[in-house]
C-alpha cells in the first residue's frame, strides 16, 4: 500500500479557482502564476493522478496487487501529488458572467506543466500484457452476449469486424498510396434530400475500392449488432424505436463511416446519446474480442498449436472525445454511465466536485449563450475512463483507459509540453473512434489546439510500452491506422475549419457522410429578423481562399471606407463588425494611421474599463465609428447602443449573430435615435463565403449571390 501523507491547504482563494478562456485566445502560453501553482495542480489539470489505484495497463481489467506495489515504489512523488490533490473539493462558486474575470488568464507555470505531462502519463502499467492472468469466468460472462451468434457469420455482418479485422495488407497498401501519397480525389456517390427532416446528405468514397462494410439500416437498434448490455441500457432509457432523424444519423455511425452532422440548435441533444452508445459498443466489442482470442491462445498453447490472432493497437485507449468545457464533459460522462450498465463508478465524487457546478448566466442573455456557459465552463481538462465488466473507473491513467475525454487545449499541453522530455503522445497511437462535439464552442476558443491534436493522432509511438507485437494488427504496425479511424464531428453550424476536419484530415476508407440542414428563404436567418431594414450585400472579387483576406482588405479600404460617410445617412453611430481578429488589427491600424476618423475599437482582449468607456462614448456620439469583433460578441453578447449604420466586414460564422447585430439598429430605432428607412446594413462577401452565406440568405439565394453577374444585392 502507498504511504499516507497529510494533506495541506494550498491557501488559494476561491476566486482563483475559476479558469477562463483567455488562454484559448493565445496559441502559446506565457508567464507563470506562482500563486496558483498548487491550485492548478488540483483542479485544472484533471488528468488521472491516481496511479496507486490503477496500474494494470491491460486492455482487459485484471487487478494485480503485486504489480501495483512494484509500480508505486518508484513513484513516491507522484503518489504524494495524488494524495494531496485527489480529494480536494472544488466548491460551487458565484459565477459572474460577462466580466473580465470570466476570461481569466490560463498561463501556467513549469510545475503545472509537469503535472499534465507526468502524473497521468508516465505510469508504467504493463501495457500490452493484456492477455495474461485473465479470469476465465470473466471471459465466459463477457461472451454470453453473443451466444446466439455464429462467429463466421459475424465477420461478414458486423461492421466492427469487417471494418477493423477483414481488410487485407495488400488492399490497405494500395489505398494508402492513392489516399495518402497521391492525394487522389474522393468520389461523391450519393446525395439524398430528406424534406420532412429538413436535411440533406452527401456520401463520399475513397479513390480505388471502398472498404464496403455491410451497410446495416433499420429503425430499430435491436437489428444492429450492438452489445446486449449497451442495447438494454439504451432501450430502458429511451425506448426500442428510433425517430426518422435518429435512424438516419445512427446508420453511418454504426457502419463506421465518418460523419459531419449539424444539429442546428443547442436544444437538439439526441445525437449525443447515439455517439455515446456507439463509443461504448466499440469499447465492449474490442474488449470482448480480446478476451475470446486470449482464451483461444491459452487453449492452443495447451494443445501445442500456434495461432496468430491480431486484435489490438499499440496502446489501450480506443475512443477520444474532445469537448469545450468541463460542463460538457460532465454531461457526456453521465450519458456514458447511463448507457454502460456499470454497477459502480470509482472516483465519481471527485469527478462531481471538479466538473460539476450549479451555475447559469443571467436570464437577460440569449438562450444559446446560457447553454454554452452554464455550469463549470473551465476549458482545461483531460480525463481517462476505464471500463470493467461491472464498473467504471474515472481518472484512470491514460495508458489503462478505454476512453479519453479532453478539451483540445488540455490535451495539446500534454502533447507539446514545453519540456520536450515530458512530451507524450503514445496514448493516442491507437485511437479508432474520434468524436469532436460542440465544435463551434471549441472554434471560438482556439481551433489551433484541435489541429495540434490531429497532428499526433494515430502516430506510431516513441516507446512501445511492453506491447505484445504478436497481437497488434498489421495496419497499426504499418502506420495505416488513420485509414481506418472513424471521425465523428458535431456542430451547430458549419464553418470552413470544421468542414476541413472531415474533408482534409480524415481518411476513413469506409467513406464520409456529410449532413447539411436545408435552409430556404422562408426559414433563413434573414427572414427571421423582424425589421424591414435595408440590407446590401456587396460582392468583391477574390481569386482563391488564400488570397481572400488581402482582397477583402483592399476592397474595404479602397471602395468602402472612402464612401462610408457619403453612403451613410448619419455621421455617427457607424459600427464595423469584423469576424477575424487578424483582420480587425489590420483595419484598426489603417484607421489609426491613414484616416481621420474618430473611432473606437473593442475586442476580446479589451479590459472591462475600456469596454464600458468605449461603449458609452459611442452611444453618446463622441466616438463616430466603432470596431467590434465576433469573438467579443460571442463571449459577452453585448447589446450595443447608438448603432445607426452597420458594416459587416465579413459574414458572422454564427447566423444568430447576424440577427443580433441588426437588432442593434432596431434598438436605436425604438429609442427614436434613427429612422428605420435611413438606417443601413452593408455586408461584404466573396464567392468563398458561400457556407456562411447559405445560413443567412438560404440555400436557394446563396448560389445566385456568389455566381451571378451582379455584384450588389439589396434586401429588406
From Swiss-Prot:
One of its GO terms (molecular function) is U3 snoRNA binding. It is found in: Nucleus, Nucleolus. GO terms for biological process: maturation of SSU-rRNA from tricistronic rRNA transcript (SSU-rRNA, 5.8S rRNA, LSU-rRNA). GO terms for cellular component: nucleolus; small-subunit processome. Transmembrane segments: none annotated. Pfam families: Utp25_C (PF06862), UTP25_NTPase-like (PF22916). Residues 15-26 have a biased composition (Basic and acidic residues). Its main location: nucleus. InterPro entries: P-loop_NTPase, UTP25, UTP25_C, UTP25_NTPase-like. Component of the ribosomal small subunit (SSU) processome composed of at least 40 protein subunits and snoRNA U3. Belongs to the UTP25 family. DEAD-box RNA helicase-like protein required for pre-18S rRNA processing, specifically at sites A0, A1, and A2. This is U3 small nucleolar RNA-associated protein 25.
